Amino acid sequence: MTRNHNARFAGVRGRMLIAAAAVLAPLAMASPAMAEHHPTGNFAPFKYCPLSNKATEICTVANTNAGEFTVGKKTVPITKTITLQGGLHENEKTEELEFIAAEGAETLSKTEETVPGGLLGIKAPKSWPLILQELFNEYVINKGLTGVTEITELAKPASAIKLNTTNLIFESGTALQLPVKVKLNNAFLGNECYVGSSSHPIILNLTTGTTSPPEPNKPIKGSAGKLEILEAGNLVRLTGGALVDNSFADEEGANGCGGFLFSWAVDPLVNEILGVPSKAGTNTAILKGNLEEAVAEAVKASE
C-alpha cells in the first residue's frame, strides 16, 4: 500500500469519525462479481463489499425495511427489505465519495412489492369487515389476473449513486442521490414494463433533513437515526433513520408495457392508471431503515 493511499484511507476514516464524534459530543456534555468474502462478527453484513477492488476504502450497507414510494396516483408501501450495498472511494481531487458496485450480489436488491389495488386500482370497500377486506384484496385483486407487483431498480451504473455521509449524519442537504426506474410485473404488461428508464431515470435526492418541495407537496422531515461507533472507530452504524424526498419528478411515464407490438397502446393506459408522467411536488419517497459503514481494511481483517 502506497503512502498516498494510506493518507487517503486515513482521510476517509477520519471524516467518518469526525462527523460521528461531532454528533455524539452534545450527548456527552445506494454488476455482481464472482468474488466471495466472509467477514465475521459486526462486519458480517459487509460480505458483498467489493473488497477485491483496490479502490474500495469504505464498505457500506443500507437496509430499507419500511416506508412508502408514491409516483403519480399510486402509493406502494414498503413491506420487504430493500438493500443498497457496495463500496466507497474518496476522489482525491474533488474529495467526493465515489460509489463502487457490490461483489456477488445486486448493488440495489430487486425486491418485489405489491401494488395495492392492482392494475385497475380496485380495493375492497372499507365498509366491509376487515377480514373480508383483507381476503378480497389479497386473493381476488393482488393475486388475481389484475394483480401487479413492482421492483425499484437501479437505472444507471453504481458509479452514478452519490452518498454523502456527513449530510446524512448532520441531517442537512442531499444524503443519497439514487437514479431509479420502476418495473411493473403483470402478465398483461409483459416483461419490460417500466416507469422511468435508464435514459430518463427518476432521480431521488434523499435527505435526513427537511425537504422543500414545490406545491402541492408540503415539507417532510427525515432522520439520521441513532448513531453508534463500534470496533475501535472502524464501524459506524445508524439505526431507525428515514431518508425522504418529495421534490422529484417522473418525466417519462410508462414505457415498454404490453411488449414491443402493443406498447403504443398499453403505455398510455398505464400512464392514465398511474397518473404518470408526474411533475415535481406530486411524488414522495420515504425510506426507513438502517445504514452501516466500515473501513474496508477492518472488514478484510475480520475474515
Tell me the role of every PLM-derived stretch.
Residues 36-303:
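Extracytosolic secretory-pathway proteins
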Residues 1-35:
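Secretory targeting and sorting signals
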